[in-house]
């Protein structure tokens, strides 16, 4: 396949961002979900969109509105199931709508298995995936603040959590 304009579709595409939690609730629980998104695909197509930028729907404790991912290979139950996700892909494709997943790679949840393993030992293979500093309980390594307020450090030995 050549690297022609076909591979650069995004340069002129209309991309519609969907924050699933508040987009469309399909089951009356007050939380938007994947079936709700599917129910609006015809409307989105009429708007003339080319792609959906889907904010995180991965499993998460929701401390950072889904950006604190605890499992990149599973869907957050409040949004639906993996089968719902597969249906969304299939239905969007039928309508010529692309799906772009918001993939958060610069941090994980403190409930992610890598972090849980990393906390066990400085020798753990996952330990270097995170920022750690030696310290004493109650004394922070520096004055860096979290995006959510307060110190970016939490005693565990000490790890930085700039987000949640």
Task: Report each predicted region and the residues it spans.
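Acidic/aromatic-lined carbohydrate-recognition and catalytic surfaces
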Residues: 2-163
């Amino acid at each position: 396949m050549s690297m022609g304009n076909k591979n650069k579709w995004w340069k002129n595409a209309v991309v519609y961002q969907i924050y699933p939690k508040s987009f469309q609730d399909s089951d009356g629980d007050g939380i938007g979900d994947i079936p709700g998104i599917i129910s609006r695909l015809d409307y989105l197509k009429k708007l003339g969109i080319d792609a959906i930028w889907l904010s995180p729907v991965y499993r998460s404790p929701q401390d950072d509105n889904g950006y604190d991912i605890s499992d990149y290979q599973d869907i957050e139950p409040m949004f639906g199931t993996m089968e719902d996700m597969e249906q969304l892909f299939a239905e969007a494709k039928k309508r010529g709508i692309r799906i772009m997943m918001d993939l958060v790679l610069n941090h994980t949840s403190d409930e992610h298995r890598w972090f849980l393993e990393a906390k066990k030992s400085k020798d753990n293979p996952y330990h270097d995936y995170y920022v750690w500093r030696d310290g004493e309980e109650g004394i922070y390594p520096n004055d860096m603040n979290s995006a959510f307020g307060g110190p970016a450090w939490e005693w565990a030995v000490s790890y930085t959590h700039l987000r949640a």
